[in-house]
Amino acid sequence: GSEMCIRDRCSSVMGLGGFPASHKLFLGTLGMHGAYETGKTTANADLIIAVGARFSDRVAGDREKFGENATIIHMDIDKAEINKNVKSKFSLIGDLKDTLTTLTALCESKSNPEWLKEISDWKAQFDKTPEYNSKDFAHAYHIIESVQKLTTADDIIVTDVGQHQMWVSQKYKFEKPRTWCTSGGLGTMGYGMGAAIGAQTANPDK
């Protein structure tokens, strides 16, 4: 049902891995540290389905203007999150596995190649990765790309808090759930070492 009625997808920093980054409909993270194309897509969308999102200021920015041209459907297991930060026209409360299954069954298959082409053009135009020059210092993106080549989709990536955390969220391609450990909401400095030890203890074979 990924392509039935939803034409593109983006994620919060904490949601990375919930949808494969290699999928052609995945755009990246949204918000002040996100990709340009996700902001453009959200601003021009006619329908936004928010799944388990809380619309923090880092994601929504000016909450009064977020998705102002779109019908917003907000899905969450906690009804306290509904309309707390961004007003939605419709809401679905419950386990997301059930609510998403129900919603997908109601969707009609539609195609909008012009919209997908426009998004593709935004992505190509605003690629933030600088060209690598071995005579200069490596950019953080080049280091993250190297780490990507040395790891698998099942490996767990842990960061601390700061600029490197945002670089990883922007550039590392997470393919599976629970492979990304970071302190996004609280932003706790020093989180990384303890989280890495915990992840290794819980997953001794990784």
Model feature map: region roles:
Residues 1-6:
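Short, small-residue-biased leader/transition segments that mark boundaries at the very start
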Residues 7-12, 35, 139:
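Residue-level signal for threonine
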Residues 8, 46-48, 71-72, 155-157, ...:
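Beta-sheet entry/capping signal
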Residues 10-12, 50-51, 94, 157-161, ...:
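General beta-strand structural signal in soluble alpha/beta enzymes
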Residues 15-118:
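Glycine-rich, acidic loop regions that bind phosphate or pyrophosphate groups
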Residues 107-110, 202-206:
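Short helix-capping/linker segments at secondary-structure and domain boundaries
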Residues 120-205:
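Active-site diphosphate/adenylate-binding microenvironment
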